[in-house]
Swiss-Prot record:
It comes from the Bacteria. This is Small ribosomal subunit protein uS3. Part of the 30S ribosomal subunit. Forms a tight complex with proteins S10 and S14. Gene3D superfamilies: 3.30.300.20, Ribosomal protein S3, C-terminal domain (3.30.1140.32). Pfam families: KH_2 (PF07650), Ribosomal_S3_C (PF00189). Belongs to the universal ribosomal protein uS3 family. It comes from Aquifex aeolicus (strain VF5). CDD domains: KH-II_30S_S3.
Amino acid sequence: MGQKTHPIGFRLGVIKEWPSKWYAPKKEYSKLLHEDLKIKNYIKERYKVAGVSKVEIERIVDKVRVKIHTARPAIVIGRRGQEVENLKKTLEKMLPGKEITISVVEVRVPELDAQLVAQDIATQIERRVSHRRAMKRAIDNALKAGAKGVKVQVKGRIGGAELARKEWFLVGRMPLQTLRADIDYGFATAYTKYGILSVKVWIYKGDVLNGR
């Protein structure tokens, strides 16, 4: 069961926080959900080179608070905060009548952020770096940064093979069924001339004993 369950979704409300925090009547729920997806996809597309790990959204009545976690906050903020102001104006056009607040959080150790690691591996594969080399390098960097365990998986027509297959490496522990285990998960897609490869990364950082 633990192999098939999303590592973050499995721990929501236990040691992980929801990426979107708001309440809405049943009739408006789907509308707000699509707005959230639109905001997140737009920000990730706009700041591809900034290493955006995740985007959190909190709604209180007509106020929308957007928190961007990125490895390169200077790119998102811009010179004298001009870029983040431009982003705010764009989001206000996307969500008319809403008061937008944007905060930028720096990911201080990107080697321990599963989403950023997955994106980096996918980028290297697209640049024709050996997938095994990229996977092993990511694992080494994560372990040096303090990870207790790392698992990396690449799936698809690896190296242009006729049949799709998956390859994975696991170093250290990966207690997927332990709720208190702080496991980060990331997914990215690599677009190659042979087709699409999926990259999945699990990083075990240790146990959380005092809840969130």
